[in-house]
Regions:
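Soluble ligand-binding/transfer domains with enclosed cavities or grooves
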Residues: 2-7, 13-162
């Protein structure tokens, strides 16, 4: 099925466009075996006219029928096509991007494709309790793979288990 892109979507977000919106579902904590607690998660991907999507996920413990019991956690971050920084990019900090995006067309973005491997992907995710993660991976059509590259742990963070 073809994905219809909004006419005003930043071209660089085309590979991520199918993620934009809300996703939700249930799973099991730990190794996922029977008897482990069930959780519900809602994930939102939002675009703001910049070359990244904002990510936010909220999780709750729940009953098998979906009745929410209590909040588990919240995490947030940013996902983008992995590429070298250009002079016209936003940041660091509040420094605005150039009015003309670094990649102006689908043809420009296609230059970032790694052959049949799709596009490189970077995700930064921050958790409560002074923990941040950096992921690298690939996005190819409606499939993505991510692997943890780096962890930043503050004094309030507990041990990290991949």
């Amino acid at each position: 099925m073809a994905t219809e892109l909004p006419y005003d979507l930043t071209p660089e977000l085309a590979p991520l466009s199918w993620l934009i919106g809300s996703w939700e579902g249930q799973g099991r904590l730990g190794d996922g075996s029977a008897g482990t607690e069930i959780f519900y998660q809602r994930v939102d991907f939002t675009e703001h006219g910049l070359p990244f999507v904002e990510y936010r996920a909220e999780s709750w413990l729940c009953e098998a029928d979906g009745t929410l019991l209590r909040p588990l956690t919240v995490e947030s971050g940013f996902w983008q096509v992995d590429r070298a920084r250009r002079d016209g990019d936003v940041g660091p900090g509040m420094r605005p991007a150039d009015i003309v995006p670094a990649f102006r067309s689908a043809e420009d973005v296609e230059g970032l494709r790694a052959g049949d491997q799709g596009f490189g992907l970077t995700a930064t995710i921050t958790h409560p309790g002074s923990l941040s993660e950096l992921y690298y991976g690939r996005i190819k059509g409606p499939q993505l793979q991510l692997a943890t590259d780096a962890i930043l742990r503050g004094s309030a963070a507990g041990p990290y288990h991949r």
